[in-house]
Amino acid sequence: MAAPTPFRIGIPEQILTDLRDRLRRTRFPDQAPGAPWAFGADLAYVQELCAYWRDAYDWRKHEAVLNGFRQFTAPV
């Protein structure tokens, strides 16, 4: 059995830039008729969540927190 291998999270900036670009281009549907959350997620909430990920989420900060813990990969 192979030993666990130390691992650090390091998402390339190009990937994060691509994600922000795709979030900027998101096309939202109309809100489904009926009560919000009755037939899926509330449109306003999803739009707010998208804006947060696009404009405010600090991936590097959270990446550093996660890398503060010992991370490993292991074959299963």
Language model features: what each stretch is:
Residues 1-6, 10:
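Basic/polar N-terminal segments that are highly enriched at the extreme N-terminus
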Residues 15-76:
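Non-catalytic accessory segments flanking enzyme active sites
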